[in-house]
């Protein structure tokens, strides 16, 4: 009989309800939410689930005066109880609305299933889950203006560069190996991968830096689209691997077990390099903060989906990443290296995953009370 990864087998045993997503709907921009609709949705979720999600809080204000909103989900949201912290972000690049939808969809999944799904309840009770659904609101709103029905192709923020040029790529402006070469980013202000005048010159990555350095995140997903891959450091070099490359690969296998994404470094997955990226800074900067295992899920395929998947693809793509998002939250408490035949206490789920192998056979008892 086929052997199942322990976390996946345990997850199926723990899940007791299906997701009816009554708080999820489609936006007015080709099925995607506008910036204002995202703000309204965050307010609505806090109104309906005030005991589980914080009010939106700004981590920075853009050049055009828009807030970069953040919310937390936990059983005591906004309170530092020393629980493992996990971060989910989206829309570094303005033309990638599926990244935002995927994050919001997961938030709704957690809120609607808390108290009825044992896994969701355990994670919300024992994690501090933080969400930044739109990191680049100025670029996002620019696409709303030019293409109100969706399909806008603007990528960068809206920094005036002079001479009629606009925008810096937020995901080339982080401080780790910023501007290492002109292959992984560009010094040309007209380029889509323009890195800016200096590291953290842009409000969006600088706000994220300041926010992250004040917290204790263990892992992070920085959502993008597209390619159906999960990317991890290093991004800045074709041949270098992190000291934690084996662990990254193990994490990658777990995180993609349900959606079958490819996983690896930037070069291994999409065939080019990036410098000044979020993931390299999250992991590589270990002086101002502890290292964070950061990943970039690239949602959607190259053939059908690309930057603006059709409306009938929006929910399937978001749903395909629920398992990865849950697994990321599990990993904040430790890497699974063990086998377990029976779980009788939810707290033992993570404690017991510290010995043995990480497989169970179909038919073995997986009981959670």
Language model features by range: what are they?
Residues 1-34, 302, 314-335, 340-341:
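Intrinsic-disorder/low-complexity accessory segments
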Residues 144-145, 149-342:
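Metallocarboxypeptidase
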Residues 2-158:
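Active-site-adjacent structural elements in enzyme catalytic domains
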Residues 315, 330-369:
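Extracellular/luminal regions of secreted and cell-surface proteins that mediate adhesion/ECM remodeling
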Residues 31-35, 194-201, 359:
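Short acidic-aromatic active-site loops that bind/stabilize oxyanions
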Residues 83, 292, 363-367:
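A general secondary-structure signal for short beta-strands and their flanking turns/coil
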């Amino acid at each position: 009989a086929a052997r199942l990864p322990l976390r996946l087998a345990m997850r199926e045993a723990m899940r007791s309800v299906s997701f009816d997503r009554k708080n999820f709907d489609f936006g007015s921009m080709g099925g995607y939410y506008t910036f204002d609709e995202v703000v309204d949705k965050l307010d609505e979720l806090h109104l309906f689930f005030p005991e589980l999600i914080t009010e939106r809080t700004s981590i920075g204000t853009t050049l055009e005066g828009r807030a970069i909103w953040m919310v937390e989900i936990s059983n005591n949201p906004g309170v530092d109880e020393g629980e493992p912290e996990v971060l989910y972000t989206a829309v570094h690049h303005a033309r990638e609305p599926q990244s935002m939808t995927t994050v919001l969809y997961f938030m709704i999944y957690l809120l609607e299933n808390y108290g009825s799904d044992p896994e969701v309840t355990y994670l919300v009770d024992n994690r501090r889950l933080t969400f930044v659904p739109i990191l680049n609101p100025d670029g996002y709103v620019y696409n709303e203006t030019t293409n109100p029905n969706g399909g806008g192709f603007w990528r960068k923020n809206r920094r005036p560069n002079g001479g009629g040029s606009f925008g810096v790529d937020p995901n080339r402006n982080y401080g780790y190996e910023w501007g290492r070469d002109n292959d992984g980013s560009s010094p040309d202000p007209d380029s889509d991968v323009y890195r800016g005048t200096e590291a953290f010159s842009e409000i969006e990555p600088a706000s994220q830096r300041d926010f992250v350095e004040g917290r204790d995140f263990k892992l992070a997903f920085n959502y993008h689209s597209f390619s159906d891959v999960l990317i991890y450091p290093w991004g800045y070099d074709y041949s270098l691997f992190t000291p934690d490359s084996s662990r990254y690969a193990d994490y990658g296998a777990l995180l993609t077990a349900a959606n079958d994404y490819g996983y690896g470094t930037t070069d291994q997955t999409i065939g080019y390099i990036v410098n000044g990226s979020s993931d390299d800074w999250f992991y590589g900067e270990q002086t101002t903060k502890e290292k964070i295992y950061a990943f970039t899920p690239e949602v959607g395929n190259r053939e059908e989906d690309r930057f603006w998947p059709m409306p009938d693809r929006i929910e399937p793509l978001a749903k395909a990443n629920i398992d990865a998002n849950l697994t990321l939250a599990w990993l904040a408490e430790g890497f699974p290296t063990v086998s377990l035949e029976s779980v009788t206490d939810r707290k033992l789920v993570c404690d017991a995953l510290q010995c043995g192998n990480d497989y169970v056979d179909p038919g073995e008892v997986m009981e959670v009370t």
